[in-house]
Amino acid sequence: MQPPGEDAPAGCPFSGARAAHSAPAAPAAHEASHVPGDAGWHNAQLDFSKSMSYGDYLSLNSILDAQHPLSPDHNEMLFIIQHQTSELWMKLALFELRGALDAVRTDALPPAFKMLARVSRILEQLVQAWSVLSTMTPSEYSAMRPYLGQSSGFQSYQYRQLEFLLGNKNVQMLQPHAHRPDILEQVRATLEAPSFYDEVVRLLARRGFPIAAERLERDWTQPTRHDETVEAAWLEVYRHPQQHWELYEMAEELVDLEDAFRQWRFRHVTTVERIIGFKQGTGGTSGAPYLRKMLDVVLFPELWHVRTTL
């Protein structure tokens, strides 16, 4: 496209009177060719007997051999892959969130913004994944449910670490992992450390905002609670965004993340209601009612309340 006011170059088919006399256009580069040598892959490496292939790099043999249905039901494969892929996405979300946390601790906020944005996009991917599982009907799930035993997503240790890292702490949630000392150690370490939001509150203090001492050093195993001094700091940021642009951007990245996380939770509960109604969950929870209670959890309370205060 030519900028406004500039003449099109000679020979351009859109240049008015010259259009009728312009030379025929060259064949498009993407047009299909029937010549094998021109297919675009003739120089590609085809022998991987002595080098690493795509499958080798991704350990596809291990990944694709990790689905072991216990029932004869066709739909169990969907159920397994849905949860396995969700665990892979959560692994990446944890990786990015911990990287962002390290960046915030050193006041390197631009890299943290990039990582937080990626976590939000991961959560959007997880939201869309429920659409695939929702193709399973109650009848189909009932056929395979007896084979699941007491296994449940409630027991996902990666999901629990994600909740803890985002500030929704609960000491009792260690118990489902007591039979795996290695896993228990990981989950406990996340429980006992400051959450991502705790580190952001410390960042506010480093930037000169008067945050209450008891908020900066507290029992990290407890969930995030609303704090007036934190809200006052965010109020100042939102009233003068140009003066506190990095903090303003951090606030919006966090709201974006929690927004996506809420959508993921909502799609979770609606998918459960659609498939099993209000039956008890396989892990012993109340099922949909338990998940609905989780919709009321607020991860970053001051960032939501400050919108009313403004």
Curated annotation (Swiss-Prot):
Record NCBIfam families: trp_2_3_diox
Keyword annotations from UniProtKB, A to Z: Dioxygenase, Heme, Iron, Metal-binding, Oxidoreductase, Tryptophan catabolism
Cofactor: heme
Positions that bind heme: H268
Cofactor: binding details: Binds 1 heme group per subunit.
Domain of life: Bacteria
Taxonomic source organism: Burkholderia lata (strain ATCC 17760 / DSM 23089 / LMG 22485 / NCIMB 9086 / R18194 / 383)
Residue positions binding substrate: F79, I80, I81, Q82, H83, Y141, R145, T282
Protein name as it appears in the record: Tryptophan 2,3-dioxygenase
GO molecular function, one term: tryptophan 2,3-dioxygenase activity
Residue segments, region Disordered: 1-36
Entry EC number(s): 1.13.11.11
One family name in Pfam for this protein: Trp_dioxygenase
Segments of skewed composition (Low complexity): 15-36
GO biological process, one term: L-tryptophan catabolic process to acetyl-CoA
Reaction it catalyzes: L-tryptophan + O2 = N-formyl-L-kynurenine
Task of the protein: Heme-dependent dioxygenase that catalyzes the oxidative cleavage of the L-tryptophan (L-Trp) pyrrole ring and converts L-tryptophan to N-formyl-L-kynurenine. Catalyzes the oxidative cleavage of the indole moiety.
Pathway entry: Amino-acid degradation; L-tryptophan degradation via kynurenine pathway; L-kynurenine from L-tryptophan: step 1/2
Taxonomic lineage from the root: Bacteria, Pseudomonadati, Pseudomonadota, Betaproteobacteria, Burkholderiales
Family: Belongs to the tryptophan 2,3-dioxygenase family.
Subunit-level organization: Homotetramer.
